Amino acid sequence: MPNHAEQLAQELNLSVKNVQGAIELIDQGNTIPFIARYRKEATGSMDDQVLRDLGDRLEYLRGLDKRKEEVTASITEQGAMTPELTAALTKAKTLAEVEDLYRPYKPKRKTRASIAKARGLQPLADAILQQDAAFDPEKAAADYLNEEVPDAAAALAGAQDIIAEAVSDDAACRAELRRYYRAFGRIASAKAKDEDSVYAQYYDFAEPLNKIPGHRVLALDRGEREGFLKVGIQVDAERAAGIVSWMFARKKTGGASAAVVDAAARDAYSRLIHPSLENELRGELSAAAAEGAIKVFGDNLRQLLLQPPIRGKTVMGLDPGYRMGCKVAVVDPTGKVLDTNVVYPVPEFKRVDQAKKTIKAMVLNNGVEVMAIGNGTAGHETEEFAAEVIRELAEEKNLHLQYMVVSEAGASVYSASKLAAEEFPQYDVNLRSAVSIARRLQDPLAELVKIDPKAVGVGQYQHDMPQKRLNETLDGVVEDCVNSVGVDLNTASAPLLRRVAGVSAATAKNIVAWREEEGAFTSRAQLKKVKGLGPKAYEQCAGFLRLPEAKNRLDATAVHPESYAAAKALLDACGYTAAEIGTDRLAGLPGAVKAKGAGTLCALLGVGEPTLNDIVAELCKPGRDVRDSLPKPLLRSDVMGLDDLKPGMELTGTVRNVIDFGAFVDLGVHQDGLVHVSQISDKFIKHPRELLKVGDIVRVKVLSVDTGKKRIALTMKGVPQQN
């Protein structure tokens, strides 16, 4: 089987040597986070996203190789393989090309052509295809009459069917038409039902295949699936049929036979080729659109998971509701539940005063510093209530609290899950969601890993995606995020541990069980005692599991145990000790390394320069968190309503979702505003992701407010952004 390193290197603009190194590491069963972090010398420091792209493409190419082998075996078994066909199959770069080459040899169901062949009309078709000017098809057809072929017209019709299928099966013809469709084809839609719907804009719609954005393709697919739209591909049918005829019919020299071939070619186009290409190209559009949407979902999920935690704060979580009340939970800085309650802050229940007393008492008794408010049903009323309580506490107790509206997407799913029941068996389902909302503010990553990634509310058309591919991508994103941050071995939950490279769900439970039976881990080496965690799993996971209080200070860092000897030798060579890891004294380590020379130290330690740089960074700042450099969450102390917004107002908000046509920004009015892609920058950008990501803090200007439809149009053009 081909190696593919050269092709992948060219496609991804990487060196062949590094691609080969990455392929070997993947084939050896190493995880992507491990390769990205601890095998940089072999890959040229490819990051996890590049490695995943490489892995996906490698899987496609190997699937292509396998299909070529299957097709070759089938054609060879039929005794139809030729050197030319072998060369064409070897050269084919896509599955579509392989299937085009296989089409004439592929076992077919009963067709008009197969019926004609069974009636003995293949020789007549072959003779007509020769297009000899002296040949008279109608006269020759008389020689093929039988019980099933009553006259010359029937014989010619059967021969034409055979020729049409041969034309349709021709790989060169399909390739030429495919190019034509891609260059000049349009996807078009019309209404299938006489009724208004959300698809009204597509009732008379057409857009070039090579220009239509993915989100419109997905909208058309959904509208068709729901029965509101009729969707197809439009081209100049006469011109397309003419291309087919031009490729097969020799009109100037072929005599009467050429007319039959011309008719067969045009029939092949309208009856066989167009429907087939329409399905194929629409499938390609849908697949590309789905892949694009999955990428957007993955990017949004990555930013959501990597939102900076609010550390060291006691947080009150409020899960708003009407009939069931507002569920309240207070958690300490470690996430431990201190207090719970249910209040009714919505005015219509006439229990607002009692709700205020309860909340104030919980704040004062537990030292609450921040409130996290869910954005679901009754969210705005609860936000107004919380802002009023904060104002009163400032006046009455000189206590200055802040709050943040938190997405509660997936909270109800989690609260009713088996996992939540195991974690909080003593609490009602509704109170569990309040705990989850509070913890999301404290550490979004640790809390959100407990929820199915599809439920966190940052995707588009996610239910229309190929679910296997969507799950693989989102699971990869979660894994990359967890490992880029690192996990405290002694406090991490089983759901968080199972996202660590090399750790299965069963092994994660075994780690937790070991802690419960043996007490806290005191060294990474103790991981080897955990049931089911063998040498390979230990190699993959050890560097991502941290012990901040460990006696061996290296266990608190991202330095892999395989590099401990090198780290200690580095410290010794530069005049430091392991006891000084993480202290101010090690601030001079980078300078000492520079003075001695990286090359000299690499030779002494037996490591590459990327590993040396990582070791130095970790020794200076053990367990550093990549999230600390990102924009901090936007906390508020007062509330605005939709009616307070006026065109021209400039506000600060948080990007909540990025999709193909724009970004939704939380302004603190309980209704996200839309910055259309055309309003993001004064310069042209193709996709909002070029400038925005989930969690970004941005300045925006209000363009318009539609209170009836609850729509806010925003712009970033001409609005200075804070650095």
Region roles according to the model:
Residues 31-32, 47-146, 150, 484-629, ...:
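Accessory alpha-helical DNA-binding modules that contact the DNA backbone or grooves
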Residues 143-146, 150-152, 205-208, 222, ...:
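Low-complexity, acidic/Ser/Thr- and charged residue-rich accessory regions of DNA metabolism proteins
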Residues 280-289, 293-298, 455-486, 603-643, ...:
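Long, charged amphipathic helices and adjacent flexible linkers at domain junctions
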Residues 19, 340-347, 370, 416-429, ...:
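Short beta-alpha connecting loops at secondary-structure transitions
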Residues 97, 404, 410-411, 415-485, ...:
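Long, charge-rich intrinsically disordered scaffolds of nucleic-acid metabolism proteins
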Residues 34, 50-52, 60, 64-317, ...:
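Duplex nucleic acid-engaging cores and interfaces of nucleic-acid transaction enzymes
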Residues 13, 308-309, 479-513, 637-675, ...:
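C-terminal accessory/binding modules appended to enzymatic or scaffolding proteins
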Residues 179-186, 318-322, 376-378, 405-413, ...:
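A glycine-rich phosphate-binding loop feature that marks nucleotide/adenosyl-phosphate handling sites
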